[in-house]
Each structure stands twice: as structure tokens, then as C-alpha cells.
Amino acid sequence: MRAFGKTVLLGVTVVTALGISSIAFSQRLGKNLDEINQLANKEKNVRVATSWEPENEAALLKGFTQKYPGIKISTDRISGIDTRERIMNEALAGIVDHDLVNVSGELRNQYIKAGVLAGPIPWRNLFPKINERHFSPDGYFAASGFSTYIIAYNPTLVPKDKVPKSWNDCLDPYWKGKLVVLTRPRTFTGLAPGWGEEKTLAFARALKDNQPVWKSSQTGALTQVAVGEYPMICGMAYHSLKSTVQRDPTAKVAYAVPSDLPFQIGEAMGIMKGAKNPNAALALTGWLVTPEGQKNMDLEGRSSPYVPGTEAAELVKKHNAKIVFESWDALQHEAEMARKITGAWGFPKGKN
């Protein structure tokens, strides 16, 4: 695992479509799984830009390395928008260092429009037994990880009879001026496809009226809850809470699973056009979406709720929760919904 930090100066050079075409077909994708696997074994390498936790990688990828012992996986850890934009800009300049990239939701359409991705790929034909929600309708992405959002709290500060059971419990006057709400409203954009715009914005306004403590850092807010500065966070990513507990099992944090449980595509893998090892990248992605791969994604707290036996599926089952899924199509409207929610909170336009 390496931190991704290469900088490319593009200057004022205009990169044309011909500039990309020279690297676009340096390698070809196999026509079927047998051919893909044969070519993947010949490529022998795959380089991935991902947000996997370094300590989880060996166990996460164990099944793949056993199936493909001749393929070496190298990873670069990326986070946020900047590193992913850099990868896209480098590709436009003809530099393709990664075979497989976890592209964040805000940039997926940009990657497609820029022409830096291989595809469309017939994911659903290649992997007909995998739930179709794992594959984008346009054929450019496969979801290897999902994000779900829960309510985090400090069990020493929250009485048992006040442990929330639904999102509406965040509106209880008991929490007025006490609970934390994150300024990036991923929880509530995730609920919007199931709730509808009217209900989502009405809830956002009611939440604001409960005078929450606004925080921009999810990790920082959870640390403050753990040390007792605040009792609760109304909406945060389950995988972030899990990562905190893995690092410090004594952390005083617990979580409640609301009756409406939002799931979003948290890790969308795209194969880069001009990748040196596109078949190995496709083989790895195909393995990640299998039941075995998704069980291993439990380590990250990002498994699929649509694969029986995963942590995510058991979370839904145990708490009798209703899945609210933000589909690939709904993701296109997420930024607009985020602006409306933060507008209802009284934030300046563009803050989300």
C-alpha cells in the first residue's frame, strides 16, 4: 500500500481525443470469462487506487490471491476528490498508472465524459448470478462496496430508553442543542430516494430546529462522542465507526440501526482506458462482487446488503430494517439534493 501523491503539471497543453486513443488499446479485454482469466494470468499484475484500510488488505484479498496466485496486486490509498481528479487529469495527459480506480460519486460522470474509462463492459452478462445493483446501467462501473448510515452514540451518556430506533428520534426535544449532525448530508441524500424530496426537506428543517452541533469531520465528531463531549451523531457512515472500533476496541461508541436504513454505492470500480493490465483488473473486480468477495468486504464495513450472509444483510435482517437504496441513477441527483438539504439548514449555497 502506497499513499498516492504523484503530481503532473499539465501546463497549457490541450489534450485531444487522439492523445487518449494512442493508449486506449494498448491491451484488449477478453470477450468472455475464460479469455479474460487467461489474459489476466498473462498480465500477472494489477494496480489499484482504492480506499481500503491497509491493515485489512491481506485478508480482504486472500480469496483472490488463492484463485489467481500468479497475479500480484499493488495498491495506492486514495481519499477525497483531489486524488481522483489527479488520476483523471493524468489519464487525459496520456499517463495511466492505475488499472483499476475507485471513483467517487461526484466524479463518475466526469470520468465517463472525459473518456478515460474502458467500456462499456457487459458486467451483467459476464456475471449473471450477481445482483444487478452491483453494476452501473451504463456499463462503466461495478460496485464492490456499499455505504450505510446509522446513528452513533456514547452508551454511557445515552439512557437505554433514549437509544434511537428511527430517524425521527433525532427530533426529540431531549436532544436539543446536544446531538451532532454532519454538514455533508450523505445520510439524508441517501434517504431521499425512499422518502421523497418533500419529506426529506421537512425532516432537514425539523432537524435544524433541534439546534444540533454542526461538524464537518466525521472521524473528529466520533472521537468527541467517544470521549463524552457529545452524546450522539444523527447519521454517519457505518464503515467509519467500524474502523474506529477496530483501531480502539475500548472506544465508548455504539450504534443504532434506524428502521429506514440508507445504502449508497460506496466503492465504484472503473477500469482505466489504456490500463496495462485490464483483464487482471476485470478479474479482480469480478471477484470482489462475488459472495466470497463481499463476505471479505465485511472487514471494511462495506459489504452488500443484497448478498445473503454478509454483515450488511444481517444488519438489515437483525433490525428488521427497510433498505433505502440510492441507485446509480439517483446518484446523478445527489449533489442537487445535498444543496437543497444544506440550504434548508441555512448554509451558504454550495456547502455540502
Predicted regions and their residues:
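Early extracytoplasmic/lumenal segment of secretory-pathway proteins
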Residues: 27-104
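Short beta-strand->loop
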Residues: 118-125, 139-142, 245-246, 250-263, ...
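Short loop->beta-strand "edge-of-pocket" segments that line small-molecule binding or catalytic clefts
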Residues: 43-49, 168-186
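Periplasmic-binding protein-like
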Residues: 175-184, 189, 287-311
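A structural signal for short loop-to-beta-strand junctions that line the ligand-binding cleft
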Residues: 92, 96-103, 116-152, 168
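A bilobed periplasmic-binding-protein/Venus flytrap-type ligand-binding module shared by bacterial periplasmic
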Residues: 152-157, 192-195, 265-277, 296-297
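Ligand-binding pocket segment of bilobal, Venus flytrap-like solute-binding proteins
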Residues: 178-257
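Extracellular/periplasmic bilobal clamshell ligand-binding domains
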Residues: 311-352
